[in-house]
Amino acid sequence: ALRHGSTHLTQDWRALVSHPEIDIVVESTGDPIAAVEHALEAFRHGKSVVMVTVEADAFCGPLLAQRAAEAGVIYSLAYGDQPALICDLVDWARTCGFPVVAA
């Protein structure tokens, strides 16, 4: 899929996380237990993680950040699709002077 610029579907997330061509894992399952497991496995394989499953960060964020640092990778968060976050983004954009055409 990487070579051809296409999409790869699999049910074996461990194989995907351990693949040598994967640099970053974006975890967005919405399942905090699975998300923590996915992040820890990614760190074990030297992969950075962008955590979209905010419940996992609320549950184990400091531990995940520590494990990422120990593995020499990055643990980062991403805004999800929660309405309050969208409102914050709209406020930020307007404050910066950007016209908001849809939200």
Where are these regions (language model features)?
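N-terminal glycine-/serine-/threonine-rich beta1-alpha1-beta2 phosphate-ribose binding loop
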Residues: A1-H45
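A short helix-to-beta-strand connector/capping loop
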Residues: L2-H8, A71-V73, F98
